Amino acid sequence: VSTEVVRGRAYGHGPRRLVRRTNERHQWEKNRARAGREERGATGATEHDTGLTVDDLVFHAEYHDVRADEELARALRVRVGTRLVERLYRTRYREEAAPLNMTRSYLVHAMVASNPDLLDAAREPWPGGTQSQLCTVGVEVDRVEERVTARPPTAEEARELALPPGTAVMVLRKACVDTDGRVVDWSEVILPGDRTEAVFTTRLERW
């Protein structure tokens, strides 16, 4: 199952768009997860990271019914063979041919099946993103754990992201953990090294 949403003018040519990812985006998302649909739909995480508007973006999503292999079972803390919802996302700036990143995300089917809309790619892009989706089935995200590594791209990644020769990719693996300690979403994001900036802000307690 897949869906693609194109907003704004037709594709043209323009400069590569910088994506600035900050760890503060997660609290920003949570603050909006229970807001009204109009507020949630006005802007999303991609717009937050790029400074673009909703109308600047071309969005594509695919959903698949899959079973957990050893890697996914370990990441989601479930048994091998557990039924999952695999979600593949590509979002690009309408002036560029390559997506901003390559994302694959996994939800445990049993956790979200009570809301059929969460199994339907045609409902994407979901206003408010994953935290808002999870909120509809009574799940509150307590913390987000992220691990970032760098490596050379595969041939497929280099082609799809239109990477210049010698450019590395950043691989971000993210686990969303709920208030009961369950991993409720695990995702892997492949970020192009030539146009991604990671910003980490740590709030310190005052003396």
Residues covered by each model-derived region:
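HTH-adjacent hinge/linker in prokaryotic transcriptional regulators
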Residues: 1-83, 112-125, 129-132, 140-142, ...
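Residue-level recognition of beta-strand microenvironments
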Residues: 63-65, 90, 175
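Internal active-site segments that recognize and position negatively charged phosphoryl groups
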Residues: 74, 87-92
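C-terminal regulatory/effector modules of DNA-binding transcriptional regulators
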Residues: 78-80, 92-98, 103-207
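N-terminal leader/targeting helix
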Residues: 85-86, 97
